């Protein structure tokens, strides 16, 4: 799915606009998978281009929900980095997290709670590292457990 997505994003605006029917989408997808060496009849792709249409079209509001998943993932990776930068999973750090985030529930703005916890705004770089879109050298990012190489991949 990721390689196919990259092929779509490599198209010019005019090239993408010309792929304007389901048949053309299917033909482009088939050609792209073949060009990538991934067209294998015995193993069809799990995710097709049109599987994500609901995320980005229509009045459903799902795109906002999808964005919130990404935002949550970013907060997860940033808070992991905070723990690593501050001595790991210690009792004091756990108490600090409980006092500044968990115990507040819905009584405060979540951005304010996070700033109270981390003493800074969240940084997207840790999510980019976890997704393989940046390497750890950016701004001396700390080693984040749970990255693919930690899982033997």
Give short role names for the model-derived ranges.
Residues 1-153:
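C-terminal, non-catalytic "cap/extension" segments appended to globular domains
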């Amino acid at each position: 799915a990721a390689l196919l997505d990259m092929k779509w994003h490599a198209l010019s605006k005019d090239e993408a606009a010309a792929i304007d029917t389901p048949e053309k989408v299917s033909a482009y997808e088939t050609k792209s998978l073949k060009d990538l060496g991934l067209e294998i009849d015995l193993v069809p792709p799990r995710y097709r281009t049109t599987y994500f249409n609901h995320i980005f079209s229509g009045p459903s509001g799902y795109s906002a929900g999808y964005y919130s998943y990404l935002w949550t993932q970013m907060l997860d990776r940033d808070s992991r980095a905070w723990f690593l930068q501050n001595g790991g999973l210690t009792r004091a750090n756990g108490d600090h997290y409980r006092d500044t985030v968990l115990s507040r529930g819905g009584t405060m703005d979540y951005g304010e709670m996070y700033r109270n916890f981390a003493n800074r705004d969240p940084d997207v770089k840790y999510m980019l590292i976890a997704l393989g879109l940046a390497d750890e050298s950016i701004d001396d990012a700390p080693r984040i457990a749970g990255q693919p190489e930690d899982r033997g991949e």
